[in-house]
Amino acid sequence: MKPTKQILEDILNEVRPLIGQGEVADYIPALACVPSNKLGIAVYTNDGEMITAGDANERFSIQSISKALSLTLAMELYQPEELWHRVGKEPSGQAFNSLIQLEMEQGVPRNPFINAGAIVVADMLFSRFSAPKHRLLEFVRKLSGNEHIIYDRVVANSEMDHSDRNASIAYLMRSFGNFENEVMPVLKNYFHACSLNMSCVDLAKTFGYLANKGIQPETNEFIITPMQSKQINALMATCGLYDGAGEFAYRVGMPGKSGVGGGIIAIVPGEMTIAVWSPELDPSGNSLAGTQALELLSERIGRSIF
């Protein structure tokens, strides 16, 4: 079955009672101010159809969803052996900001979707781009077709003001020789990436290339190779939802990437992208109502990679 607006609206009505059962990300003060009753979903098909319901056009801080976009840029710039020498491809089973595993594994992060891995990727982009912050924003605007996407400076500054743990992660990796640049400028770029302000509609369009073998559906532009698209989807399926990745694969059955702003992007390879947003999170840091909405949609339209 194809997704329809009615299906999306019905699903949002079914998951709305979950609002009030999760927690917004209060460790980033600027995110704690977001109204917890927001709920939106957008589906973007490979033939260019956009189907939405709820607050699908309202922008929010995408946070760790940006890690998949930064990884895409890094895969364009670096040979595989260079990239995967510095960051792994395995699930961590730990909290996304854990230091324990990083110490035990000699400063090489398990995957690019935990904080340590994304900070390594940010360091790699910093080494190759004279202005990585501007390059990422340009890339996202091109993919989404929306020139009005911006960084939320309030969120970025809030994260910078509470950066002790991420700075510790970066300095620990530096002590093992897995960091090339000064820590704080790299972290500033990393926090700006997390602060990208986008809607479900923006996200669904932006990630279209991962549902279309590396080609952006609307423009037919080559972004990455089919092999690279497969690899990013595989990492999203195994590592994209922190230590809740297995639960998400079991319930939803799609590659996905979440952020503590309450957004999740999910991919149905060869068919569509799905973006959901609900700010309240489960204990793993994933959107509570958003995950349930994706599970219901997977069941209703009969889509899963498994």
From Swiss-Prot:
What InterPro entries does this protein map onto? Beta-lactam/transpept-like (IPR012338), Glutaminase (IPR015868)
- Coiled coil segments of this chain: none
UniProt keyword Hydrolase present: yes
Residues involved in substrate binding: 64, 115, 159, 166, 190, 242, 260
Write down the EC number.
3.5.1.2
A GO term, aspect molecular function:
glutaminase activity
Please give the catalytic activity noted in the UniProt record: L-glutamine + H2O = L-glutamate + NH4(+)
Q: Which Pfam families does the entry link to?
A: Glutaminase
Gene3D superfamilies attached here?
Answer: DD-peptidase/beta-lactamase superfamily
The broad enzyme category this protein falls into is hydrolase
| UniProt keyword list | Hydrolase
Q: Which NCBIfam families match?
A: Gln_ase (TIGR03814), PRK00971.1-1 (NF002132), PRK00971.1-2 (NF002133)
Its family remark reads: Belongs to the glutaminase family.
Q: What PANTHER family is this protein classified in?
A: GLUTAMINASE
Q: What is this protein called?
A: Glutaminase
Organism for this UniProt entry: Aliivibrio salmonicida (strain LFI1238) (Vibrio salmonicida (strain LFI1238))
